[in-house]
Regions:
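Class I S-adenosyl-L-methionine
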Residues: 1-250
Length: 250
């Protein structure tokens, strides 16, 4: 008696969830960090941009924040949770989940010839968590160049290890009009966080997510080379923003 041959058709390969783009020392303090790009997101503000996460590779991000070792990836940012600041990122959610996935080995190391096509025709967010300037500039530049556009922000313009080439890749975060003017004189395009009702400078544009309801993926002005942007402070810790201005000055 003959029997039907069982199907040997393989199930289609699942798309990769993300990639390890860099693993090495932080530019800011030399501690071990990792950059992971994830290919899908539930972030309704940004839309479906590739998200890059800059994390300590050896410490859970929640713990790193508690003990101040997030300085490797957030530098001297006054808004760090460790500084009792107003950072909007819920570290225990997405950053923690990405770190746990990294520890489980679910993200392959990025190889250009094998994986660049995943980024083709995509827009990329540099630093969904963590500061791009913690990463060697050439690495971040190459990540940005994989896609058709990028956004990015750095709070490290005053850090002793800051690479000035980031002025061409990221908005420089400013907490006051005086800071914004200072960085603009250095050649930066700024992203200023402000309180509701604050006045815009003549050379600033209100974030179009606030004024028009646009997603970042449809705007893309925060690419370091287009406009000076201002946005109303947001997030669950936004009530801490005003007190930080006293420390920042002006």
């Amino acid at each position: 008696m003959q029997y039907l041959t069982g199907s040997k058709t393989k199930a289609p390969a699942m798309p990769e969830r993300g990639f390890v783009m860099y693993s090495g020392p932080s530019v800011l303090d030399g501690a071990p960090i990792v950059v992971i790009a994830t290919m899908s997101t539930s972030n309704v503000k940004t839309g479906q941009m590739v998200q890059t996460w800059i994390l300590r590779s050896d410490i859970n991000p929640v713990e790193a924040s508690k003990i101040g070792q997030d300085s490797s990836i957030c530098g001297n940012c006054v808004h760090r949770h460790y500084n009792k600041g107003a950072c909007y990122v819920n570290i225990g959610q997405a950053p923690n989940a990405v770190y746990k996935g990294y520890q489980r080995g679910i993200y392959p190391v990025f190889v250009y010839d094998d994986h660049a096509h995943y980024f083709a025709h995509r827009k990329i967010r540099l630093g969904a968590y963590g500061d791009p300037a913690a990463v060697p500039f050439g690495v971040m530049r190459s990540i940005a160049d994989l896609g058709i556009g990028h956004t990015g922000y750095t709070h490290q313009a005053d850090h002793k290890a800051f690479d000035g080439r980031y002025f061409e890749l990221c908005q420089v975060s400013a907490d006051t009009p005086r800071q914004a003017a200072k960085y603009q004189k250095l050649g930066a395009n700024t992203f200023r966080v402000a309180l509701a009702g604050d006045a815009l400078a003549d050379n600033e544009l209100e974030c179009l997510a606030d004024s028009k309801g646009l997603q970042c993926i449809d705007c893309m002005l925060c690419d370091g080379s287009t406009k000076n942007i201002a946005i109303t402070v947001h997030g669950s810790r936004s009530n801490r923003f005003k007190s930080n201005l006293i420390a920042v000055g002006g």
